[in-house]
Regions:
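Right-handed parallel beta-helix
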Residues: 5-70, 74, 80-84, 100-115, ...
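The right-handed parallel beta-helix/beta-solenoid scaffold, focusing on the short coil/turn
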Residues: 31-33, 45-47, 52, 58, ...
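Feature marks extracellular polysaccharide-active and adherence modules
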Residues: 36-38, 57, 66-69, 76, ...
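Short beta-strands and strand-coil junctions in structured, solvent-facing domains, enriched
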Residues: 81-82, 146, 164-165
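Acidic/polar low-complexity surface segments
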Residues: 89, 96-111, 188-196
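Short, surface-exposed interaction patches in beta-rich subdomains
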Residues: 159, 165-224
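Single conserved hydrophobic/aromatic residue that forms the stacking wall/gate
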Residues: 227-239
Length: 239
């Protein structure tokens, strides 16, 4: 019998879900859970999971996939804040948008996501990848301010545009931006233009402007911004 905490009380899970079980599972890796319905107020889905698969058909609330170490979560909708925070392994895919702190650390901690992969097919809120120390985040849409702040390792790839100050106070790692780059902090220095850069064995096709930073912290991180033909003044983006 499973119970759901609501405030200071606990209620049987059957009060909220109609549960159907099919087949047998020898362990967590054999479990596939499908959640249908209104999940807007359901928090911590897949938190600390180590294996198996969860499919959420709808929007989900805070902390989906937080601290997960294995398995896969697919969200066919949007996710609230803290998606995939401090995850160390596994795969989290969100069809819609995420709010702030995707793949980030919890308040007071300096180690965010350390492994695994997060794919956001929509837009990501502010401080995506904060304190990233491993793993990979791929945002197919746009990213809000301070993406990759305090990151020390790992890769953040953004297909869309990036708002102000990506990579602030980063010490290492890689941020790859395919869209248009907003304002950078002064701690980034221009290193030049690179063709088809390779990161961890993966080649990113095209010409990229490469910055190094954050030099205010003696950082050795790389920020790569794709050059667009329609943007002849791109080098002025740090002004």
């Amino acid at each position: 019998k499973y119970e759901v905490p609501i405030g200071n009380s606990r209620f049987p899970i059957t009060d909220f879900f109609d549960i159907t079980v099919e087949g047998d599972a020898e362990g967590p890796n054999d479990v596939k859970m499908i959640l249908n319905g209104d999940l807007n107020r359901v928090k911590y889905i897949g938190c600390n999971m180590s294996g198996g698969e969860i499919i959420c058909n709808g929007n989900v609330d805070l902390h989906v996939g937080a601290e997960m170490s294995g398995g896969s979560i697919y969200v066919h909708g949007n996710a609230a804040a803290h998606a995939g925070r401090e995850m160390s392994g596994g795969y989290l895919e969100i069809d819609g948008d995420t709010k702030e702190f995707t793949g980030a650390s919890y308040i007071g901690e300096w180690r965010g996501m350390t492994g695994g992969k997060i794919v956001v097919k929509g837009n990501a809120g502010k401080q995506c990848g904060e304190c990233l120390t491993g793993g990979r985040i791929h945002v197919l849409g746009n990213c809000d301010i301070l993406a990759g702040i305090h990151m020390t390792k790992g890769i953040i790839e953004i297909d869309g545009d990036v708002n102000r100050w990506p990579g602030g106070q980063m010490k290492n790692g890689n941020i790859v931006i395919h869209g248009f780059l907003g304002r950078l902090l002064e701690g980034f220095v221009l290193e030049g233009v690179v063709d088809d850069p390779e990161i961890d064995g993966e080649v990113f096709e095209g010409k990229y402007i490469q910055y190094k930073g954050d030099i205010g912290l003696n950082g050795k991180g790389a920020l790569l911004s794709l050059i667009h033909i329609s943007e002849p003044t791109r080098l002025r983006c740090i002004s």
